[in-house]
Amino acid sequence: MIQKLTSEQRATQLAGLHGWQAVADRDAIQRQFKFADFNEAFGFMTRVAIKAQEMDHHPEWFNVYNKVEITLSTHDAGGLTERDIKLATFIDSITA
């Protein structure tokens, strides 16, 4: 079973990510993205969806026109895990 990150691990891992913030009321991280238009936002979401399916680890997300908000947490573990960090790292790599 996958284990939640400790507070120290979470702080260390979060420091290595670009633009991700801890969610105040839960053990999760979140980032907002803004694109030129809906097509660009949807293309980004498609790339994330393909990777998430490969990882069998799916984000919570919200999209309005050119904005996408993603929240990552591992429900089975009850909080942030290495899976979330790996998906966030992938997301960072396609938005750099």
From Swiss-Prot:
Q: Which reaction does it catalyse?
A: (4aS,6R)-4a-hydroxy-L-erythro-5,6,7,8-tetrahydrobiopterin = (6R)-L-erythro-6,7-dihydrobiopterin + H2O
Set out the biological process GO terms recorded for this chain's protein. tetrahydrobiopterin biosynthetic process
Return the Pfam families for the record. Pterin_4a (PF01329)
Q: Which PANTHER family match?
A: PTERIN-4-ALPHA-CARBINOLAMINE DEHYDRATASE (PTHR12599:SF0)
**Disulfide linkage:** none
Domain of life where this protein originates: Bacteria
Q: What is the lineage of its organism?
A: Bacteria, Pseudomonadati, Pseudomonadota, Betaproteobacteria, Burkholderiales
Q: Return the EC number.
A: 4.2.1.96
Query: Which keywords describe this protein according to UniProt?
Result: Lyase
Protein family? Belongs to the pterin-4-alpha-carbinolamine dehydratase family.
Per its record, what are the GO molecular function terms?
4-alpha-hydroxytetrahydrobiopterin dehydratase activity
Q: Give, as one word, the top-level EC class.
A: lyase
Record-linked HAMAP family: Pterin_4_alpha
| Protein's name according to its UniProt entry | Putative pterin-4-alpha-carbinolamine dehydratase
Q: What InterPro entries does UniProt report for this protein, alphabetically?
A: PCD_sf, Pterin_deHydtase
